[in-house]
């Protein structure tokens, strides 16, 4: 009988299996897709490294780099080209750079704020006056939009918070929980009153050495390299079953899992590392309230469209893509394109000389229907909007479209309270564990951390006495 069954072979499930194997506990992964890695998928097209899902991870969160180092891939880690780290926002038909010194939507430098064309004078004045704001701690949760509007006004929500968070979460700031999405900002506001003063104070305490690290990191061969390394490290210690779990039931000693191939598995410990809505469908017979809570987590759908061009054919302003990492498109601009990254500017090694790759994003909570459109319709839509927004008409040499239905969890207002109740229903000694992007962070480091924590809880119970 397998001691541990892990439902889901994405980065959360793989991390759980890796740390269990390192501690001497075998496990079985159930994965319905024909590959491991979940939304992490790297392709090589005409010499270009194309990420169908996430392209990097935040340097500030250590769990990903810690795992990469353990796997012997530290020499494969590269940082983003922060020298060109400028992001543009479309406003009134133009691409306007985000002002220098912006920490998400918090200004930290006066001159760039005064001279930016992205915000009007009323917003600039309000941002300046925000420095005088006194602490006003609030009980309970509120939306990101309410929080940012109270500090900086509605325009800051429309042209900073909304496009930035749409690019990260595919979500709506009027629905997202500020306590879950921007917890550090809530702490700083409670302590200092002014977000700007709080960010500046936190930066001063951290010291200058932290600024030397690039904002984003990735692997030379793409993030698929991480999936391959984990799979190689656990080979022989972990069984991967290419099937779908249909239901989980309590058994006399642990759990029974019914599989879609007609078989059953028994386990002492189960890690639900799939999407929360899939977990909800599995757990109704184990814990009805937990299943109900998991079912309340909304998910956004997204699509990435990678377009490859010959640089000689590129007819944008000045014959090259706009300087910087890419651009964001606020909902107020009434376009379907959410964002676009110039891959070669962010990670130069991923695009050979003479090539240009645009990685475009569509979907989100406001436009999930775009995933149902044909590849031809999507390609035409992206080409039309790139021409309108970035001003070029070059025909792509290749197009790669990736659809991710219901893949990104949304931490809506009240998420901290719901999460606390989920955790109460999954105590460390209860045999049932949750991991994934639906709980305490959506990024790769967050998922790795939660997988490691699930493994540590299990190892505390099942670790062989000889280890």
Regions found by a protein language model. Name each.
Residues 2-29, 459:
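N-terminal Rossmann-like FAD-binding beta1-loop-alpha1 element of flavoenzymes
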Residues 8, 81, 241-244, 249, ...:
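Short loop/edge segments at beta-strand edges and connector loops
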Residues 12, 35, 277:
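Conserved Rossmann-like nucleotide-cofactor binding loop
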Residues 21-45:
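Glycine-rich FAD pyrophosphate-binding loop
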Residues 23, 243-358, 362-372, 376, ...:
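Mid-domain catalytic core of redox enzymes
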Residues 46-135:
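Dinucleotide-binding Rossmann-like beta1-alpha1 core, especially the glycine-rich loop
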Residues 86, 106, 110, 123-248, ...:
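Active-site/ligand-binding neighborhood in enzyme catalytic cores
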Residues 99-101, 320-323, 336-467:
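Conserved flavin/dinucleotide-binding core of flavoenzymes
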């Amino acid at each position: 009988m397998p001691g541990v069954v892990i439902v889901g072979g994405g980065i959360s499930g793989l991390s759980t299996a890796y740390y269990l194997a390192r501690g001497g506990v075998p496990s079985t992964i159930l994965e319905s897709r024909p590959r491991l890695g979940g939304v992490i998928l790297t392709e090589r097209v005409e010499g270009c490294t194309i990420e169908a899902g996430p392209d990097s991870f935040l340097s500030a969160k250590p769990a990903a780099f810690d795992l990469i180092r353990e796997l012997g891939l530290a020499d494969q880690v590269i940082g983003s080209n922060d020298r060109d780290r400028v992001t543009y926002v479309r406003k009134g038909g133009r691409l306007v750079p985000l002002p220098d010194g912006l920490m998400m939507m918090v200004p930290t430098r006066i001159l760039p704020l005064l001279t930016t064309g992205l915000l009007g004078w009323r917003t600039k004045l309000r941002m300046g006056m925000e420095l005088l704001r006194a602490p006003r701690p609030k009980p309970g949760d509120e939306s990101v939009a309410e929080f940012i509007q109270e500090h900086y006004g509605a325009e800051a929500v429309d042209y900073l918070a909304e496009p930035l968070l749409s690019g990260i979460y595919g979500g709506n700031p009027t629905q997202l929980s500020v306590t879950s999405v921007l917890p550090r900002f809530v702490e700083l506001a409670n302590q200092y009153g002014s977000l700007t003063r709080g960010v500046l104070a936190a930066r001063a305490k951290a010291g200058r050495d932290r600024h030397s690290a690039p904002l984003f990191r990735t692997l030379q061969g793409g993030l698929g390299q991480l999936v391959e390394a984990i799979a190689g490290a656990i080979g022989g210690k972990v069984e991967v079953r290419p099937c779908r779990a249909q239901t989980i039931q309590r058994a006399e000693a642990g759990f029974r899992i019914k599989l879609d191939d007609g078989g059953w598995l028994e386990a002492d410990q189960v890690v639900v590392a799939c999407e929360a809505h899939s977990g909800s469908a599995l757990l109704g017979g184990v814990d009805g309230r937990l299943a109900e809570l998991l079912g309340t987590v909304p998910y956004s759908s997204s699509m990435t469209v990678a377009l490859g061009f010959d640089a000689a054919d590129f007819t944008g302003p000045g014959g090259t893509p706009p300087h910087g990492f890419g651009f964001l498109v606020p909902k107020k601009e009434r376009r379907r394109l959410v964002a676009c990254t110039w891959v070669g500017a962010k990670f130069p090694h991923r695009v050979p000389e003479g090539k240009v790759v645009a990685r475009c994003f569509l979907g989100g909570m406001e436009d999930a229907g775009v995933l149902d459109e044909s590849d031809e319709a999507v390609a035409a839509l992206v080409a039309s909007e790139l021409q309108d927004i970035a001003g070029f008409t070059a025909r792509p040499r290749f197009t790669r479209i990736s659809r991710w239905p219901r893949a990104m969890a949304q931490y809506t207002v009240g998420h901290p309270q719901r999460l606390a109740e989920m955790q109460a229903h999954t105590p460390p000694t209860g045999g049932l564990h949750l991991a994934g992007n639906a709980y305490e962070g959506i990024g790769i480091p967050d998922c790795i951390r939660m997988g490691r924590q699930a493994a540590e809880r299990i190892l505390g119970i099942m670790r062989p006495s000889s280890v």
